[in-house]
Design a protein with these regions (language model features):
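Glycine-centered hinge/linker elements that transmit conformational signals in sensory
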Residues: 775-802
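Extracytoplasmic/periplasmic substrate-recognition and gating elements
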Residues: 123, 336, 831-904, 932-939, ...
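Extracytoplasmic/periplasmic solute-binding protein
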Residues: 693, 697-706, 711, 732-785, ...
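Conserved N-terminal structural module of periplasmic/extracytoplasmic solute-binding proteins
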Residues: 338, 418-660, 968-998
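Hinge/lid segment of periplasmic solute-binding proteins
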Residues: 567-584, 649-712, 735, 837-844, ...
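Extracytoplasmic "Venus flytrap"/periplasmic binding protein-like
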Residues: 608-687, 718, 722-726, 815-816, ...
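Extracytoplasmic
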Residues: 34-540
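Long, aromatic- and glycine/proline-rich binding clefts that accommodate carbohydrate-like moieties
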Residues: 843-845, 894-956, 986-998
Length: 998
């Protein structure tokens, strides 16, 4: 049987090779095949299609052409491109000869490049485009490209195509325990806990077809080609890509289980007997992301291995394995040719009411169609799942004796069309909302007749259309999940309100607020449903008739496990993160001021690299940083504190820019002056000058910056196009834009904050203090004019002072906002309904006499400190140098994106690490341009009084507009600021040099 199967496969391969045709377009046509479009023009094409809604969806594209798939296979070598550009200029790419075992010439394309290939097509029909590529080192994120055909975007899904990387855990050694189970040799700390493994990239040559990055299309993306020469353009979005060749072909479709099983039976396949292969899920061979590594689950004794005391690496997946396209792969051996069953021990207690889906492949291909979308329903406990049909009959898998792989990939499955339809509905609902508020405003008078029906004659038709689409989505959802779920409740609420508004459109004035809430809830429904988490404990590949034992945990066993956990919680100090150093070893104590996720990651990095490299042990404790100063003064503080926020506990809070912790501790002799270390000057070259300003005073440096954030401008591309507005470059442009927005009942979003005031102050040439920081400089003409300008936006232009701008940006009420750049990460995760409709740019600036635009902004961030009570200052300094280094900050950024996704992206102050984070190339360009203008806000004794009084003056002016004068209010407050500065300088016996103007 085995020989016959291998012979059949060999014949198929020879036939496939025989049909292959290496295509070389005639030289005379190659130059003509190039499109001539620049990368910027391609980017504009994507934007125009996306924001105008003109881009065709793949299903519509496929339905509009004859469903014919030619058997021909066309291949173009990577080196045979017809055009290459880099950074918008003609260039020559780098070449790789016989790279990593692949014979021939490969071409390296950068993330800021475009490359074009020409195909000579003889027969019309649909073709699948695939690439043989190698994921060369980059920023450790998925490779992204836009794909164009003959200079056009055939359909929306090709605007962003991802090519994945391959990862593996850095622990590969294993052993067989006393129970005969193969386990990995994880590192352990002194408490017996397994250390979290790291992930390293394991690149290899990959042939990949094109898939929808959002997962709404679950099949391969195809191109319809007519006879003649066609040009395929690959436009870089993120990460470099090494291309060996491109291929146009059509693979044999995957048959259903019964058809495949009949073919196996006809070939003589038989059941194997007596074999059980057990695979611990945490022993994964490869994954698609550094987010996927062994996890520790102590919730139940059902997992293996289990312990109520130690934290053991015993599962994989969970919340980190939820995003479309993520996959995990395992290797296994079977001793005999024949049929096997496959079972999993899994838990899906994350998504209630619907199932999560996986595409299951063996040796790189799905054996039959049912595994292209296999569902795992909700279960609160660990369970045994045998891969079976809908009637519960276990599938049989034919396997040759020897080594195999099994891969499970997140897909949206049967929910994909529903989610896509609801996404379209949300887009329409938001458009309707913007149309209505142009007539009524965001807070309409219920007793006024706005004549909505007359002013918006197309509204009824729009409401009816979106209602029908939403009703269809609800019906399809119920067909999938039945009536035993509440997942449709949000959609039904939205549909019912649409029924009410179709009947009487004037009701918008009464229900506009609830309509907005319901639209937001519908958008959030998308975020919830596209999350597809699943946790695995182990897998079995076993002969039919063999028994696999998965212990069922009863009530008493579960109760005893919880009692043991409770007992150990009184014995083990859970404020200690990971390894607790031995009493007689050299160690420093580290306090961390953020969350447990961060603390666990930091501790694992310390154990993996810092302690082995330096011999310095680190006791890590997770504490509330509000206690740091008191604990230090009481002699109970740490040696080192990292991720220290502002002394009011809110780094980056709305009311504060800068971080005053370092200087406040420094003037009280609570922290070490880092300039005493001989290599301090070399270390601070890692940071921008602006990040250091807030940490020093009178030549001393009391800390190192960890994070640095600053404002950026966010704008809705679709709405600006709709209104005919350009992205504002100056504040004069902003005022013009605000006029247009006001006419359409929209606003410019900018909450009052020190970041906004500092931005205006610095752009106008002002300063907070004189040169030595002993006097306020807010009484200068520049500062007074800046304060006037600051107040005018909230008095003359009536900007909102309270409502959060991020949700109003999402609904379109505020299509242009100024916000901290970290909002980018939140929008990427929480606002899929406006994906592709927004972008970022440097903040508006002030035009100078020479015509240049000053875009200065202030910044804030977290700080690292060495406490003066330490007995190990040199060891502490070694730790800070390690912690703020390029590689460590880069790895920390990757690790934090592992459990939290893009929302966990770290705004590191290390400039090299910042540029290695997985930003799109265009967004990174915008951030780096703004970075050029970032300034630090100096911190001085008594400096907390500056913003407090500026803020008080602001609210006096903006609430008492008839009588309060910006100049007088600010001048009065400057007197109070100077009094506090003088008081603090006297308190700490500081001497002013009397120098002016900084």
């Amino acid at each position: 049987m085995a020989n016959r199967t291998r012979f059949t496969r060999g014949v198929c391969k020879l036939l496939a090779m025989g049909m292959a045709l290496s295509v070389l377009v005639p030289a005379g046509l190659r130059a003509e095949a190039a499109t001539g479009l620049s990368q910027q023009e391609f980017d504009q094409l994507v934007s125009s299609y996306t924001i105008s809604g003109d881009a065709v969806k793949y299903q519509d594209y496929a339905a509009s052409h004859a469903q014919h798939r030619p058997q021909a296979e066309l291949r173009v070598e990577g080196r045979d491109f017809v055009r290459y550009e880099q950074q918008g200029q003609p260039a020559l790419p780098e070449y790789r000869e016989d790279y990593q075992g692949m014979e021939g010439t490969s071409v390296l394309t950068t993330e800021d490049s475009l490359i074009e290939y020409a195909f000579q097509v003889e027969e019309a029909g649909f073709y699948d485009l695939s690439l043989l590529y190698y994921p060369v080192p980059g920023k450790n994120s998925a490779i992204q490209r836009s794909i164009f055909l003959d200079g056009q975007l055939p359909y929306e899904e090709l605007s962003l195509v991802e090519f994945q990387r391959i990862w593996r855990m850095d622990v590969t050694d294993s052993y067989v325990n006393a129970e005969g189970v193969t386990l990995r040799s994880w590192g352990k700390d002194n408490q017996g806990n397994d250390l979290k493994p790291g992930c390293v990239e394991a690149p290899e040559w990959i042939e990949s077809s094109l898939y929808d990055s959002q997962g709404y299309v679950t099949t391969q993306l195809s191109l319809y080609l007519t006879p003649g020469v066609h040009t395929v353009s690959l436009v870089g979005l993120r990460e470099p890509l090494l291309i060996r060749w491109l291929r146009l072909s059509n693979r044999v479709s995957v048959e259903d289980y019964q058809t495949v099983k009949d073919a196996w039976d006809s070939a003589g396949a038989r059941d194997t007997t007596g074999h059980v292969v057990r695979i611990e899920a945490e022993n994964a061979a490869r994954t698609s992301s550094q987010m996927l590594y062994a996890k520790q689950d102590q919730s139940s004794p059902a997992v293996y291995p289990a312990s109520a005391k130690e934290l053991l690496n015993n599962t994989i997946g969970g919340e980190s394995w939820r995003l479309n396209g993520q996959w995990i792969e395992w290797e296994f051996d079977v001793p005999e040719d024949g049929y096997y069953h496959i079972a999993l021990v899994d838990k899906q207690n994350f998504v209630k009411g619907i199932y999560v889906s996986r595409r299951i492949t063996i040796d790189g291909a799905a054996p039959f169609a049912e595994l292209l979308n296999y569902g795992f329903s909700y279960s609160s406990n660990w369970r045994k799942d045998i891969l079976s049909d809908k009637q519960g009959s276990a599938y049989r898998f034919y396997l040759d004796a020897g080594k195999h792989t099994i891969r499970m990939e997140v897909v949206l499955g049967e929910f994909s069309d529903i989610i896509s339809d609801v996404q379209d509905c949300v887009t329409q609902l938001n458009s309707i909302y913007r149309s209505v508020i142009r007539i009524t405003g965001v807070a309409p008078d219920q007793y006024r007749d706005y004549e909505i029906e007359r002013n918006l004659p197309e509204l009824e038709g729009q409401l009816i259309q979106v209602r029908q689409e939403l009703d269809s989505a609800i019906a399809n959802l119920l067909d999938l999940i039945g009536n035993n779920s509440d997942k449709e409740a949000v959609l039904i609420t939205m549909r019912d309100q649409l029924d009410e508004l179709i009947y009487d459109q004037e009701r918008f004035t009464e229900v506009l607020a609830t309509y907005k809430v319901n639209v937001r809830a519908t958008a959030n429904w998308i975020t919830q449903v596209i999350s597809q988490p699943l946790q695995l404990d182990r897998l079995y590949v076993y002969s039919p008739g063999s028994e696999i034992r998965v212990e069922k945990i009863g009530f008493w066993a579960g109760l005893w496990h919880e009692i043991c956990r409770l007992f150990y919680s009184f014995v083990i100090d859970y404020n200690q993160i990971g390894n607790v150093s031995k009493e007689d070893s050299s160690a420093i104590t580290l306090w961390i001021g953020t969350g447990r996720d961060q603390a666990n990651v930091i501790k694992s990095m310390i154990d993996a690299t810092f302690t082995p490299q330096t011999g310095i042990n680190v006791n890590v404790q997770l504490v509330d940083m509000n206690t740091l100063l008191r604990a230090t003064l009481a002699g109970q503080g740490p040696d080192v504190a990292i991720q220290v926020p502002n002394t009011n506990g809110a780094a980056g809070a709305v009311l504060n820019s800068g971080n005053d912790s370092a200087v406040n501790y420094g003037i009280r002799n609570a922290v070490v002056d880092l300039t005493q270390f001989s290599d301090y000057g070399q270390v601070v070259e890692r940071f921008s000058e602006s990040a250091l300003v807030q940490l020093g005073f009178h030549g001393a440096a009391y800390g190192l910056p960890e994070t640095q954030t600053f404002p950026m401008m966010f704008y809705r591309k679709d709405i600006l196009m709709e209104l005919g507005l350009e992205v504002p470059q100056t504040w004069d442009d902003v005022k013009v834009a605000m006029t247009v927005l006001a006419k359409n009942q929209m606003e410019f979003g900018m909450l009052p904050s020190e970041q906004v005031f500092a931005m205006l102050l610095y752009q106008n040439g002002g300063a907070y203090y004189n040169q030595d920081g002993s006097h306020s400089a807010l009484d200068s003409d520049q500062a007074i004019n800046s304060f006037k300008q600051y107040c005018e936006y909230y008095t003359d232009y009536k900007l909102d002072k309270e409502t959060s701008v991020d949700q109003r940006f999402r609904t379109g009420e505020c299509p242009i906002i100024i916000a901290d750049y970290t909002l980018y990460n939140n929008l990427q995760v929480s606002a899929p309904d406006i994906d592709g409709l927004w972008s970022i740019a440097p903040v508006p600036g002030t035009r100078k006499a020479d015509g240049t635009i000053d875009r200065s902004v202030g910044s804030t961030g977290l700080t690292s400190l060495i406490m003066s009570a330490t007995t190990e200052p040199e060891a502490c300094w070694e730790f800070l140098k390690w912690w703020t280094s390029d590689d460590v900050q880069t790895n920390f950024g990757y690790e934090m994106e592992s459990p939290q996704g893009k929302a966990g992206r770290v705004p590191t102050a290390n400039l090299e690490a910042f540029q290695k984070l997985a930003w799109k190339a265009t967004d990174m360009d915008a951030l780096l341009e703004q970075y050029r203008w970032v300034k630090g806000i100096p911190q001085v004794p008594g400096g907390y009084y500056s913003w407090r009084n500026v803020n008080n003056a602001f609210y006096t002016v903006t609430t008492d507009t008839d009588f309060a004068s910006p100049r007088e209010e600010l001048m009065d407050k400057v007197v109070l600021i100077n009094e506090e500065l003088h008081y603090k300088w006297d308190e700490f016996a500081l001497v002013s040099t009397g120098r002016e103007g900084a």
